[in-house]
Amino acid sequence: MTTQITYFATAARGFEEMLKTELEQICQAECKVAQGGVHFTTTQRGAYQALLHSRLASRILLPLVTTKIFSDLDLYATIVGINWAEIFDPRDTFFVDFNGTNREIRNTQFGAMRVKDGVVDYFERKGFARPTVDKDHADIRIHVYLDRENMVVSLDLSGDALHMRGYREDTGKAPLRETLAAAIVLRSGWQKGTPLVDPMCGSGTLLIEAAQMQAGIAPQLHRKHWGFNAWKGHQQAVWKEVLEQAYLQQNEEIQPLFFGFDLDHRVLAKAKQNAKNAGVAHLIQWQQGDIAALKNPCPNQVGTVICNPPYGERLGTTPALIALYSVFGQRLKQQFSGWNASIFSGEPELLNCLRLRSHRQFKAKNGPLDCLQKNYQISERTAAEQQADELKFEQNAQVAPDFANRLAKNIKKIEKWAKQQGINAYRLYDADLPEYNLAVDRYDDHIVVQEYAAPKNIDEQKARQRLLDAVSATLYVTGVETNKLVLKVRQKQKGTNQYEKLANKGDYFYVTEYGAKLWVNLTDYLDTGLFLDHRLTRKMVGQMAKGKTFLNLFAYTGSATIHAALNGAKSTTTVDMSNTYLNWAEQNLELNNLPLRNNRLFQADCLQWLAECRERFELIFVDPPTFSNSKRMEDSWDVQRDHIKLMTQLKRILTTDGTIVFSNNKRGFKMDFEGLAELGLQAENISHKTLPLDFERNPQIHNCWIIRHIEN
């Protein structure tokens, strides 16, 4: 049993040095770090100890052959040449894990198949029964690693991966692997015998791993099936001694200094069961609670706060997370003075919302996500200092103060005006400060923060951090509930992709505008269903429509139609190519108790419908897109290039005393007055009259024209 053998322990990238230290402690092995793991030389007893006690290793492999191969024939020949009869009985099942490729073996499934063929053919040539492959519960796992022409064939002594401790029956959302959780604990700076608090513990993995460390419970103590059970080289007597020693080293006389909090009582129930399965239920105290009410369970001791808070892969989840991290940082400073904190997150920018300065940080992968763990020393402060800090936080939250002050100033000015106007949907901020390139809109009790795409010369990380800061400040200044703040990242739109669906929440509510009720949806589309900058245009159209036949072309959700109908239009006709938005317009009509018999809706290519129209209208509102190349349109559309073509068709259906209200959003649009004159039409630019107070900083957001027949 004193024979020294070199094994290989695999680990997640970045944890190799930690694993080396751990293996040296567990089995006094000679270790050499490699990419993705550690070569360690020890006895078979030492290998058993590593299997039982390692918290960081993913698998422990016993190399059988290390060689060079240049083709699948070389691979097959190598496998057939191994004396498998000395390794396992053909009556046992096996499975092949194949990792890596080269020029000849370009597919891991093909590589695994060739290995399987080699093993099966070996036994059949020796006159044995053909062994069976079992993907899920194999007795023997063969591991093959291929790097260019270098190949290592190993026996996987672990069986199932070692992160599968066996204590987790169920988990909450986004669970941590146990090996990663153990690494987070080891990197946190937590000292055994001191309190450990997880304020958002989820299924409890961090606390359970730490509690097992404290109690001396081997992570694999209760594992039933091992990859070496069917191995002919297995030494059962030695394994039994290693197992008995592990039971003896457990420490049952330790204080219960582990505390887990979570808002979700269902997840806490799972955490409690997991702790029971892991043998540490008596060491961990669980409590349901909101992070905003977090209190230090051991105020007279110094310990560590450890946490893997939620983080969103999609930006749309960010407002609530910004608020969560901001409040978390505040509670840490208020309740855990003098303590250490270690926070692990998949969105490093969110860690900045804690407003704490880290003294150490570590990178790690959680599945495909690049994550960051930051360690903090929470400075000790007197009660007076804490009170002063809380007051300072209350005053301006110390986040984006310039932005917060400008937003507060705008709110004071605009909300008074909005109340007088009888509107509850309006813009509060429109890129007033260059470093905060975004818009803030209010829709009743909801807020939309809409980021404009940053210029190419602006660092992406810096722009992202400013956005997070602005959202945090907006939450504070407006007092809006986090679930009523919507964040949109705006890119330059091409064609009709402004109508692409982003989500399917179906959260509609209505806003009011000069007596009209209009449905909006803040989450499912890039736009909300209501262009706020056209508010005065809609009001004007409504006033002009009284007693007239009205056409709304490129109607979007029909908001101008609502104003016209409410103001006494004789009839309205609404045309849009999008069935989604035409249905939206119908819902707007129903909301305002406007009957469909007087308010017709047509889903059609607007230009084609116009060419075929034989009716005449006294008032026409047309607000076409700047550019479109929709597959449902026969030709592309460019408002600068094609507006005279449009006017040619509109003149045909316009009554002699009729009016066209023409608007578009193209910056630098130039009206073709000569082309209009040839048609017998004249235009008046009224853009300045249709620009509301909340958009006065952006006079080029739209241009608007009154077009009539030239009087003889």
From Swiss-Prot:
CDD domains the UniProt entry points to: AdoMet_MTases, THUMP_AdoMetMT
An annotated GO cellular component: cytoplasm
For this chain, one GO molecular function annotation is: 23S rRNA (guanine(2445)-N(2))-methyltransferase activity
Record-linked Pfam families: Methyltrans_SAM, RlmL_1st, THUMP, UPF0020
Q: What Enzyme Commission number does this protein have?
A: 2.1.1.173, 2.1.1.264
Keywords associated with the record: Cytoplasm, Methyltransferase, RNA-binding, rRNA processing, S-adenosyl-L-methionine, Transferase
Extent of the signal sequence: none
Which superkingdom does the taxonomy of this entry point to?
Answer: Bacteria
Keyword 4Fe-4S attributed: no
Task: Give the chief site where it resides.
Answer: cytoplasm
Localization recorded for this chain is: Cytoplasm
Catalytic activities:
guanosine(2445) in 23S rRNA + S-adenosyl-L-methionine = N(2)-methylguanosine(2445) in 23S rRNA + S-adenosyl-L-homocysteine + H(+); guanosine(2069) in 23S rRNA + S-adenosyl-L-methionine = N(2)-methylguanosine(2069) in 23S rRNA + S-adenosyl-L-homocysteine + H(+)
Q: Which residues form a coiled coil?
A: none
The segment(s) forming the THUMP domain are: 46-157
Task: State whether keyword Methyltransferase applies.
Answer: yes
Q: What does this protein do?
A: Specifically methylates the guanine in position 2445 (m2G2445) and the guanine in position 2069 (m7G2069) of 23S rRNA.
Family matches, as PANTHER family: RIBOSOMAL RNA LARGE SUBUNIT METHYLTRANSFERASE K/L (PTHR47313), RIBOSOMAL RNA LARGE SUBUNIT METHYLTRANSFERASE K_L (PTHR47313:SF1)
Its family remark reads:
Belongs to the methyltransferase superfamily. RlmKL family.
| Protein name, as recorded | Ribosomal RNA large subunit methyltransferase K/L
Species of origin: Actinobacillus pleuropneumoniae serotype 3 (strain JL03)
Q: Which gene encodes it?
A: rlmL
